[in-house]
C-alpha cells in the first residue's frame, strides 16, 4: 500500500452521505469508496445529510472515517478545497450534481479528470413512466430531462453507468461519449438452505417519481 504522501487524490461529490444499508445505489457508492480508499486519498462532499437524523448521520460519517476519508457535509467551499488539493479525478453522482460543479473544477483544476456516475439514466426512467401513463406532459418532461442530461454528459471526460444496457442507450443517443460500466458490488452470500424458491421482490425507492 502506498504512503499517504504518494497516494493520488480523488474527489467524490454526492447528494448525501451514503446510506449503504438502506439503498442499492448508496451501497454501490460505499463499495466504490472502500475500493478506491485502499490506494487513494479521498475527499467526500455531501450536499446534505441523510435526512435520517443525527444518530444515523453520525453512523454513516463514522463508516467513512474508518476508511480514512475526509468528509464534508453541506458547509464546505469547493473553491477552497480545489485550491488546496490537486485531484487526479472528480467523481460526481447524478448529472444534476455534476452540472453544478463541473465549471469550477475545469477552471481551477483543468488537469482533473471529470467523471459523472449516472447511477441510472434519468430520461430513460422518465420515459418508462410515460409508457405507463401515456400522458403527453410526461413525454415532455422526458424530452427536457434528456436534453439537460446529455448536455452535462458531453462536458465529462468519462461517464459511468451501472449496466451495459444503459451504456448502449447512451452510445446510441450521444455517440462519442467515453463510457464505462461499474455494476452494483455485493459480497456473495449463500442461502442457509436451498428450498427451490426463485421469487424475488424488489421495492423501488419512492423518492423517484417514476417508481
Q: What are the functions of these language-model segments?
A:
Residues 120-122, 182-190:
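Short beta-strand->alpha-helix junction loop in the catalytic core
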Residues 82-100, 113-115:
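Short N-terminal targeting/anchoring amphipathic segment
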Residues 165, 182-185, 196:
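Carbohydrate-associated surface elements
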Residues 1-59:
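N-terminal subdomain of nucleotide-sugar transferases
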Residues 122, 137-158:
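Membrane-proximal helix-turn-helix segments that form the acceptor-binding/catalytic region
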Residues 99-101, 150-178:
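A short, active-site helix/loop in glycosyltransferases that binds the activated sugar's phosphate group
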Residues 108-126:
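Active-site proximal beta-strand in glycosyltransferases
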Residues 9-14, 193-210:
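Conserved donor-binding/catalytic core segment of Leloir-type glycosyltransferases
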Amino acid at each position: 500500500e502506498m504512503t499517504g504522501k504518494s497516494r493520488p487524490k480523488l474527489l467524490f461529490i454526492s447528494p448525501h452521505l451514503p446510506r449503504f444499508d438502506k439503498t442499492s445505489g448508496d451501497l454501490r457508492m460505499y463499495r466504490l469508496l472502500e475500493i478506491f480508499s485502499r490506494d487513494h486519498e479521498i475527499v467526500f462532499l455531501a450536499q446534505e445529510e441523510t435526512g435520517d437524523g443525527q444518530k444515523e448521520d453520525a453512523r454513516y460519517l463514522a463508516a467513512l472515517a474508518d476508511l480514512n476519508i475526509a468528509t464534508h457535509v453541506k458547509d464546505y467551499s469547493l473553491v477552497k478545497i480545489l485550491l488546496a488539493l490537486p485531484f487526479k479525478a472528480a467523481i460526481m453522482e447524478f448529472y444534476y450534481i455534476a452540472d453544478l460543479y463541473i465549471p469550477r473544477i475545469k477552471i481551477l483544476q483543468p488537469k482533473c479528470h471529470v467523471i459523472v456516475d449516472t447511477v441510472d439514466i434519468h430520461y430513460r426512467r422518465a420515459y418508462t413512466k410515460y409508457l405507463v401513463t401515456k400522458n403527453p406532459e410526461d413525454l415532455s418532461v422526458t424530452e427536457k430531462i434528456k436534453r439537460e442530461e446529455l448536455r452535462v454528459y458531453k462536458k465529462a471526460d468519462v461517464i459511468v453507468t451501472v449496466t451495459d444496457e444503459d451504456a448502449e442507450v447512451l452510445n446510441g443517443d450521444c455517440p462519442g461519449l467515453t463510457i464505462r460500466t461499474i455494476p452494483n458490488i455485493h459480497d456473495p452470500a449463500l442461502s442457509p438452505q436451498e428450498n427451490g424458491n426463485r421469487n424475488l421482490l424488489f421495492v423501488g425507492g419512492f423518492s423517484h417519481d417514476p417508481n
